[in-house]
Amino acid sequence: MPQRQQGQSLLVLVVLLGALLSALWWTTEAGSAVNEKQRLANAADAAALSAAVWQARALNFDAYTNRAIVANEAALAQSVSLRSWSSHMTRLLPGAALVTAWVPYLNSAMMTLQRLWHHIDAALQPSLMTLEATTSLVSHDIAAAQRVMHLGTAAVVPAIVRESLAETDPRYRLSTGGEAATAVWATEWLRFASFYGGSFRWRQRDVVHRSLDGFSSDRRYTLSPLLGTSLVRFEKRGGTELVDFDNWRGLDTLSLHARRGILFGSLRERTPVAWGGAESGQASLSRGEHGDSYRRNPRASRLADRAVRRSAGYLGLPSLYDLSAAQRERFAPPRILVRVTLDDSARRGAKALLGFASVPTLAGSEQRLEGSAPRWFAESAATTPFERPHPRSDGAQELPSLFSPFWRARLVNLTSDERIRLATIDGAPLWLAVAP
């Protein structure tokens, strides 16, 4: 009888089982790696975008507080203007009452208006002075909040990146390159905007002056009593200005201008009719234009200077943040770079899912199955461009500034230089760094 061979099928089964287990392990490992890489990339995107959202909010907060302070300064200018104009009216109405004393009905109306305005001015002056002091105090509180927000952002943004990663997955953390990138970002953030204080407050003073209404900035008119002639005329001049950054000053003058001769000679100030002035803040020897009052009505202006009603409630124009000089020339908002890492030992791969990391061989030993990378990386970048939600109605392009709250958070692509720099710090292969 022929002899039967036994045991050969067991060898084939061992080889087949090892091949099947290896295929299962590597399939599971590949799927796990893809999922983990995607989660790592999503975590990096979420951290970068969350940090950029805070950066945009900080810039918009700067813009809103700047606009609030400008609005308060305009309100202060209106208050000082009203006090100056009211003081001017208290001197104008008695003279007007004398001129109209011979006119029936008008004389009694003018006398009543004179007495009424005297009481109005008596209540108006102290009330507006109190309002000016309160408004100035509020403006400086707003400026202090702006400084806290702006400087605090340098510490908040890195904390947001780390917190976002921890909330996504406690295993994720910033790599060494990612930590270095946050330090670079903090430096760029502090250079992006400059703190305009002291004599550099001319920027916000210019914005404030251009934001004033017509009554505050220039109160002038010319009245010719003798229509059709140029023999005499009344010249009203006045205006309110921020003098030396720490003093709001208003002046109002009215003078009679006439020719030196009856028909010849230039029209010049002959008689001051009414004048008034008001200021709030530190006393200053400087003076403004005040609607060309000093040139057109010099005598009345000197009288107004001596009659200025002063208030020390104004604390000065607050120091504010705005784009630095370098950023105004070449606009480049700070870029938030995030590079996340995960140790392969902490990854939930085929070993954790299947419970084994080796397969049997014909020699009776175990062949270990291991992943390809000891560490995993993912990077992302975000920034805050200046974008209006809708185009301007006049078609003009608005330049970036910290007076307009149009800062938006957006994810952007990393440049090759950024990828190489991060990979170099982390010790990763440079040939992989340039791959998107």
Predicted regions span which residues?
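Alpha-helical assembly-interface signal, strongest on the long, hydrophobic N-terminal helix that forms
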Residues: 1-84
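Long, compositionally biased low-complexity segments
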Residues: 70-436
